[in-house]
Amino acid sequence: MKNFASIKDEIQKIAESILKEYNLQIYEINNFFDFESDVLQILVEDITEPNKALDFDSIISSNEKLSDALENFPGLSEPYMLEVASAGIEKPIRSKDELVKAVNSYIHVELNQEKNTSSEIEGILLDFDVNKDTFRITYFLKGQKKKVDFKYEQVKFARYAVKF
């Protein structure tokens, strides 16, 4: 799509109103060329629980309704494929607000500096202390339960994780 940057906000507004009906929200909107056609990809997540497993029927229904709504959208005059999909179970946590929403979730976090001899931690994000502006994560290291406090500014990378 040649004009994707100029129409992305309008597509987002249309998609947001439709996705709310299915208790979904936009995680990310992408445009890329694949299988010899333009693809408009809308990655979604649950509104209330960002890492909740999504209902396949909701994704299909929202895709169909969004496809109908975009059919008459003047900015999409060239052929394209619409793909509404889950953002994934191990999706990146991209902001402090998203990390706050991840409290009580199992996450993987990489810190700029080591804490308790490790800069990479996988565990349950227990809490966000508003007064201290710090997060607390609990994890196991060599069979012992540990807790670490960190600030968002110390985070190099974070994502949801699957506990095995």
Curated annotation (Swiss-Prot):
GO cellular component: cytosol
Subcellular location: Cytoplasm
Origin superkingdom: Bacteria
Biological process annotations from GO: ribosomal small subunit assembly; translation
Predominant location: cytoplasm
UniProtKB keywords: Cytoplasm, Ribosome biogenesis
NCBIfam families the record matches: PRK14643.1 (NF011236)
Role according to the record: Required for maturation of 30S ribosomal subunits.
HAMAP family per record: RimP (MF_01077)
Family, per entry: Belongs to the RimP family.
Designated name of the protein: Ribosome maturation factor RimP
